[in-house]
Amino acid sequence: MSCIQTTFNEVLEKSLNHILDGIRPQIEAIDDAAFVAVTFAELTTLHLGGTPMAAVRCRSQHSVVEVVRLLDAHQIPLLIVGGGSNLVIADGEIPLVAVILDCDDISVTLDTGRVVAEAGAVWDDVVRLCVDAGLGGIECLSGIPGSAGATPVQNVGAYGAEISDVLVSVTLLERATGAVMEVPAADLELAYRYSNLKFTGRGVVLGITLQLHTDGMSAPLRFGELARVLGHEGPHPAVQVREAVLGLRAGKGMVYNEADHDTWSAGSFFTNPIVPESVGDHVRSVVGDESMPCFAAGEGMVKLSAAWLIDRAGFAKGHQGPGGRVSLSTKHTLALTNRGNATTDDLVALAREVRGGVMDAFGVLLEPEPVWVGVSI
């Protein structure tokens, strides 16, 4: 970074801090909102990231709305933080305010299967509560780290299911107007790991509404590995599917455990690439493997397995990055992990190495799944 850029950043940060100091009493006066001293390494499942210029913990939807409106009115950059499971944040001082979602009410209506969860609710708590209550439809999404509010933003999915399968609407704070509105799922343009909320900053999800089955059964299973574990495609009791999914995820290091560095990750780091059929044919010809994972993904397009591509490009489970401080998980090539004393720069170096290796081997560009703040791949 040049001296000029460094000086500009220092001036910007001082200016933002001055503005923030001016509205601090107003934020402190908001019910259920409180300033807290915290680093992003403490807020993310990667245990990486520097220090925001301030952090505000919000324990109600109302406090989220009021804090965001106030920060936006004074043009202070902010980052909404829920479970912190899908964030890659730069080292050092980060010139923004972290707004931490701590509103976590979950309401379940058993006779209709309607579920309403506030954005800060732990996602797997939502799944567990629903399955235990005899509702089906989200059991395949068991064990995914993070908060309920993050699930529609990137249309979270696993084991053949996506949140779009059951999402009715989101309660959204529209930042341009400050209005709170109920947005139907159909208006979110939900697609593979995408919604029109992703990367845009246009709104803050305050809550989600889901429609589940009341018979306690899963939908027919669309993921071969899961169907094999359970013996057939089903339907199966949702509680049985949840147990199987948690077992599969744990075996891949995809259930967060603070004591296990294999789970200090952002989950699946790259999305499965959707490419023209000709590219899929090229990859197959390079490896000479007719059993290559390849799935139809619309007219003339196929979806490839990012984990398979990474492995076939020569990056085995446990492949180490700079100084061994980061590595691919020893259980799954798609998870990039902090081995306990890494920096974000270490992680970015490993991500670039893997991405570049896959491009060199197959001509396929892997796209990262997490949200990047202050750093890029």
UniProtKB/Swiss-Prot annotation:
> What would be one Pfam family of this protein?
FAD_binding_4
Q: What cofactor is this protein dependent on? A: FAD
BP term (GO), one? cell division
Q: Which reaction does it catalyse?
A: UDP-N-acetyl-alpha-D-muramate + NADP(+) = UDP-N-acetyl-3-O-(1-carboxyvinyl)-alpha-D-glucosamine + NADPH + H(+)
Q: Which family does it belong to?
A: Belongs to the MurB family.
NCBIfam families hit by this protein = PRK13903.1
What is this organism's lineage?
Bacteria, Bacillati, Actinomycetota, Actinomycetes, Mycobacteriales
Q: Residues in domain FAD-binding PCMH-type?
A: 48-215
Is the keyword Cell inner membrane in the record?
no
- Signal peptide boundaries: none
Full protein name: UDP-N-acetylenolpyruvoylglucosamine reductase
Keywords (A to Z) from UniProt:
Cell cycle, Cell division, Cell shape, Cell wall biogenesis/degradation, Cytoplasm, FAD, Flavoprotein, NADP, Oxidoreductase, Peptidoglycan synthesis
InterPro entries with a match to the protein in the record: FAD-bd_PCMH, FAD-bd_PCMH-like_sf, FAD-bd_PCMH_sub1, FAD-bd_PCMH_sub2, MurB, MurB_C, MurB_C_sf, Oxid_FAD_bind_N
The protein's job, in short, is:
Cell wall formation.
Record the organism. Corynebacterium diphtheriae (strain ATCC 700971 / NCTC 13129 / Biotype gravis)
Q: Which GO terms describe its molecular function?
A: FAD binding; UDP-N-acetylmuramate dehydrogenase activity
Specify the enzyme's EC class, one word: oxidoreductase
Give the positions the UniProt entry annotates as the active site. 193, 268, 369
- Superkingdom, taxonomy of origin: Bacteria
HAMAP family per UniProt: MurB
Give, as in the UniProt entry, the pathway in which the protein acts.
Cell wall biogenesis; peptidoglycan biosynthesis
